[in-house]
């Protein structure tokens, strides 16, 4: 297979998605005065919109793997299922299992050698088989903080396996199956919004996120095929593009008002996935736009190490909180909002940079053998 297309601007959008996720976790405090302050409540409230970073990652990953598969079919006439799964494993597994196994070793050491009380962890098989999102639905998130993040990787892995077989054996129905995923997701979300309302299911269940993946793959299909719809939206001028971003920002400002309506909750993920789908097309294919995120070396750098940023920032937060409690460090609203997030971000960036250069890169070089 020849060199696959590289979307420079999309790398940078990964950094922006991480900032969303980071904002949901970075404002930490155990001081009642800080927690009850109006400023903290306001900032932390909007920070909870960080889940949209994950929504974007779902759409983007589906777009990229589908695009690569279509390229592969065009160049070779077939899709290498085994090679695809190996490539995905080489990218996802090293950091993932490093964190999982380290966490479990630390857990047993702390519990049985230090005799320190610590919440029980899920059965490790939930992580090994990438089904911890289902565990979380039933049991909640009251376990080691930085392991909780891995539920989204479970969903990604489940989709990779499912989608690889679709790409291998049902490729000619790709468009229809993508649309079907969106419909299934909407029906699923409707059922768990009205018939059997369970918030954890709406958030953590794989079926609830199928719309994200369906839209991502559909965007790849219409872009590669250069459909009329693609030609229209990929040539949006500045004003039309600005209108999309205004809709997005407005939805964030009034999020709690808009999505307090149960009917709109059904369409929440699809709504944002469509906006993210537009951003992907705009950044990947519209050469006339004035704002191209890939022009920022800083965003491109952070985008390159974004997987590490996502996986490691929870560990840094965990140690920060532990340190604050261990040394009884006094807190105030300014340290919580400015100092601690800055320390967390800088530390996470340094760890992720060296992880990418000296750990992940070894595995990434192996990926080239499987194209």
Question: What do the predicted segments below correspond to?
Answer:
Residues 105, 213, 218, 241-358:
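Alpha-helical transmembrane segments of multi-pass integral membrane proteins
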């Amino acid at each position: 297979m020849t060199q696959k297309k590289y979307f420079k601007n999309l790398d940078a959008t990964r950094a922006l998605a991480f900032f969303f996720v980071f904002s949901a976790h970075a404002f930490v405090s155990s001081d009642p005065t800080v927690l009850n302050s109006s400023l903290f409540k306001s900032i932390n409230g909007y920070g909870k919109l960080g889940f949209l970073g994950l929504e974007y990652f779902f759409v983007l990953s589906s777009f990229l793997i589908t695009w690569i598969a279509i390229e592969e079919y065009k160049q070779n006439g077939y899709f290498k299922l085994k090679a695809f799964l190996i490539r995905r494993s080489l990218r996802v597994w090293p950091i993932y299992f490093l964190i999982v196994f380290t966490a479990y070793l630390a857990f047993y050491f702390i519990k049985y050698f230090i005799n320190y009380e610590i919440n029980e962890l899920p059965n490790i098989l939930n992580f090994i088989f990438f089904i911890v999102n289902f565990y979380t639905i039933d049991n909640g998130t009251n376990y080691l903080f930085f392991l909780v993040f891995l539920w989204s990787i479970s969903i990604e892995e489940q989709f990779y396996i499912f989608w690889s077989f679709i790409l291998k054996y049902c490729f000619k129905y790709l468009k229809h199956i993508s649309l079907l995923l969106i419909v299934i997701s909407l029906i699923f979300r409707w059922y768990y919004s009205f018939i059997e309302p369970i918030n954890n299911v709406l958030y953590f269940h794989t079926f609830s996120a199928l719309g994200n993946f369906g839209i991502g793959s559909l965007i790849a299909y219409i872009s590669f095929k250069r459909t009329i719809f693609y030609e229209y939206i990929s040539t949006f001028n500045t004003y039309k593009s600005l209108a999309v971003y205004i809709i997005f920002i407005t939805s964030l400002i009034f999020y709690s008002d808009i999505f307090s309506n149960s009917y709109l909750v059904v369409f929440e993920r699809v709504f944002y996935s469509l906006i993210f789908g537009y951003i992907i097309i705009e950044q990947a294919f519209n050469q006339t736009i004035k704002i191209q995120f890939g022009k920022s070396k800083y965003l491109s750098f952070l985008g390159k190490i974004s997987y590490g940023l996502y996986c490691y920032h929870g560990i840094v937060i965990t140690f920060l909180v532990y340190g604050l409690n261990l040394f009884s460090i006094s807190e105030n609203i300014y340290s919580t909002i400015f100092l601690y997030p800055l320390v967390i971000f800088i530390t996470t960036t340094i760890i992720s940079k060296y992880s990418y250069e000296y750990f992940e890169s070894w595995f990434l070089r192996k990926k080239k053998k499987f194209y």
